[in-house]
């Protein structure tokens, strides 16, 4: 839905993704994967980079040059590993990174937490939910988790089995 898409974009890319609670991994059930990813990609291609004091700017600068270099190196490394990387290509910037989507096959594909406008997307099958929860629990990350579903029992199950700080 449109509301869900906006929540994903805001959670992943507000503050240029430099919040400890920013969305880092979006796990999408395969039945809705293609449509949702298409909507998210379409939205990030409209994000404006610049001074966040300006009302019409969506993505502010990366905190410093070292962080910017690390994020760019991470994106390059993911491309070299053969991961599908989607990044809207706009005007070059020495202080910003365009919102980036990296498709992953497993939570373990993420080596380190990236504090920037990078969203990892993982497609999963509904019958693999226990495996997905185990991967999340084994990842070492888990400050926050959001669960969006129309099936309340699935949300309850996912939440009760996940070792995270906040849901």
Model-derived regions, located:
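Conserved C-terminal structural/oligomerization subdomain of aldehyde/semialdehyde dehydrogenase
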Residues: 80, 96-167
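ALDH superfamily catalytic-core signature
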Residues: 1-105, 127-130
């Amino acid at each position: 839905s449109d509301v869900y898409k906006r929540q994903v974009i805001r959670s992943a890319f507000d503050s240029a993704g430099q919040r400890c609670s920013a969305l880092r991994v979006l796990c999408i059930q395969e039945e809705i994967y293609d449509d949702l990813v298409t909507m998210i990609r379409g939205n990030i291609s409209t994000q404006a980079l610049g001074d966040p004091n300006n009302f019409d700017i969506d993505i502010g600068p990366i905190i410093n040059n070292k962080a910017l270099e690390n994020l760019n190196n991470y994106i390059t490394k993911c491309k070299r590993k053969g991961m599908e990387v989607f990044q809207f290509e706009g005007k070059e910037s020495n202080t910003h990174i365009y919102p980036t989507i990296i498709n992953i096959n497993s939570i373990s594909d993420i080596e380190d937490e990236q504090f920037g406008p990078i969203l990892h997307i993982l497609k999963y099958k509904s019958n693999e939910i226990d495996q997905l929860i185990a991967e999340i629990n084994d990842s070492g990350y888990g400050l926050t988790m959001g669960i969006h579903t129309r099936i309340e029992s699935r949300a309850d199950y996912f939440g009760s089995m996940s070792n995270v700080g906040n849901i």
